[in-house]
Amino acid sequence: MSFEGSSLWRLRQKVGHDLILWPGSTVLVEDPNGRVLLGLRRDSGEWAMPGGGAEEDGSFASTALDELRQEVGLHAVRADLIAFACVSDPQDHVVRYPGGDLTHYFGIWFVLRRWEGEPVADGEELLEVQWFDRDVLPAELMHSSAVAFAHYARYLATGIFQVG
């Protein structure tokens, strides 16, 4: 779904650019070689993991699966999503978009290692998709994705669900 017409877009019509608190999900797609899938965002020119805000009647898991399908064309099932962190720290998760909208995201981050399909950018939110080694990420990485990789590294090292 494009931003226009989404639940968040409808709310924006009422509150303008004011701060909105919004639930969402992000998916760290990891292939068998340990590479991660990132998309180049049209709005910011930064690389980021697939993800986005929840829609009405959605859950964290359904949001993750919907965003994965919509943004990069991959299909997965809920049982293959592994939650590794929940996030809400305003220092890391308040985003001011180029148009001026201010959003504080509260979300769950999932890792996904099994899916169907080949990744393809949607052409609307993402201009391209690319696999990266986790240790060699692009300099133009969206801040929230950089935070996600730090949480994921701690999760892998400890096996403990991360809170941030």
Regions found by a protein language model. Name each.
Residues 1-26, 99-100:
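Acidic, metal-coordinating catalytic segment for phosphate/diphosphate chemistry
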Residues 19-21, 98-106, 123-126:
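A generic structural micro-feature
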Residues 29, 109-113, 130-133:
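Short, well-ordered beta-strand micro-motif
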Residues 31-75:
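Conserved Nudix-box catalytic region and its N-terminal flanking loop in Nudix hydrolases
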Residues 35-36, 116-120:
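Short helix-loop capping/hinge motifs at secondary-structure junctions, enriched
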Residues 45-46, 118-164:
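Nudix hydrolase/Nudix homology domain
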Residues 74-118:
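Active-site segment of metal-dependent pyrophosphate-handling enzymes
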